[in-house]
Amino acid sequence: MTSTPADALRELEARVRDLEATAERTGQNLDAALAPLRTQLETLRREHAAGLSRWDRVQLARTPGRPTALDYVDRLCSDWTELHGDRRFGDDPALIGGPARWQGRPVMLLLQQKGRDTKTKIKRRFGSANPEGYRKAIRLMDLADRFGLPVVSLIDTQGAYPGLEAEERGQGWAIAESIQRMVRLRVPAVCAVIGEGGSGGALAIGVGNRVLIQENAWYSVISPEGAASILWRDAAQAPLAAEALRVTAADLLDMGIVEEVVPEPPGGAHLDMDAAAEALGSVISRHLDDLSALTPDDLLAQRAARFRSLGAFEER
């Protein structure tokens, strides 16, 4: 059987892991043997990443172990205090938030949290929020405006929760209200897609002065599976839909939908959470610095102009 580049990458990763485990178990210094292998591994990861298809990137965004919003908060924030409830129906663990210090700067966080293991993923519905989640986000944006706190949102969802109960409680209305409230923020708003950015569920907390995306994340009006089910009546056509939708970070930057692509460690953010967090933290902080010079009226005008300028049409 012919070996593929992916096979070679997995084989080298296994060799490095085995040597690292041996060094830890025996106390031997194997740095001399590990150094060239790690260099080769980084090179292979970069070459592999360069050849990934759009569907490959979608799969990478869903990789088990990819950093969640709270993984970044743990590494980048201090004084994080989660606030609960929408003051109407209840709390939603899929969309959380509250005040914190982002690398020392006071901010209001809005976070779509998928969960870190099977139990918490089920509890948080894999990051798919109910209406009370979006209404909680509106409440937190009200507080951000009142206290002059910049808003930082980390987006990671395939879409809003599609259940009957969510529709009965006004899912579409809640998303629309959240978008409207974010447009009217009089404080800086920086949004970053850190994994999946699907449909209105992502856009509800994605109306920022700056929108960023990590290198292996995706962002689209619908998930590839959803588009395939509608267009071809077959979710198995998701790879084809991903190509048609142009969902990747590079596509979005090319179309002007995001301002910047945040680089990830070779192979993906899940392989080095600390490095991924450092890159994300510094990029968001830089954009917050840039926006801090604008007046509230300037922020409103810039945000409105940004979203009105998206898209293109051709007159015939």
Swiss-Prot record:
It comes from the Bacteria. The lineage of its organism: Bacteria, Thermotogati, Deinococcota, Deinococci, Deinococcales. It comes from Deinococcus radiodurans (strain ATCC 13939 / DSM 20539 / JCM 16871 / CCUG 27074 / LMG 4051 / NBRC 15346 / NCIMB 9279 / VKM B-1422 / R1). GO terms for biological process: fatty acid biosynthetic process; malonyl-CoA biosynthetic process. This is Acetyl-coenzyme A carboxylase carboxyl transferase subunit alpha. Pathway: Lipid metabolism; malonyl-CoA biosynthesis; malonyl-CoA from acetyl-CoA: step 1/1. Its main location: cytoplasm. InterPro entries: Acetyl_CoA_COase_a_su (IPR001095), ClpP/crotonase-like_dom_sf (IPR029045), COA_CT_C (IPR011763). Pfam families: ACCA. GO terms for molecular function: acetyl-CoA carboxylase activity; ATP binding; carboxyl- or carbamoyltransferase activity. GO terms for cellular component: acetyl-CoA carboxylase complex. It catalyses: N(6)-carboxybiotinyl-L-lysyl-[protein] + acetyl-CoA = N(6)-biotinyl-L-lysyl-[protein] + malonyl-CoA. Belongs to the AccA family. It is found in: Cytoplasm. It is an enzyme of class 2 (transferase). Keywords: ATP-binding, Cytoplasm, Fatty acid biosynthesis, Fatty acid metabolism, Lipid biosynthesis, Lipid metabolism, Nucleotide-binding, Transferase. Acetyl-CoA carboxylase is a heterohexamer composed of biotin carboxyl carrier protein (AccB), biotin carboxylase (AccC) and two subunits each of ACCase subunit alpha (AccA) and ACCase subunit beta (AccD). Component of the acetyl coenzyme A carboxylase (ACC) complex. First, biotin carboxylase catalyzes the carboxylation of biotin on its carrier protein (BCCP) and then the CO(2) group is transferred by the carboxyltransferase to acetyl-CoA to form malonyl-CoA. Its EC number is 2.1.3.15. Residues 36-290 form the CoA carboxyltransferase C-terminal domain.
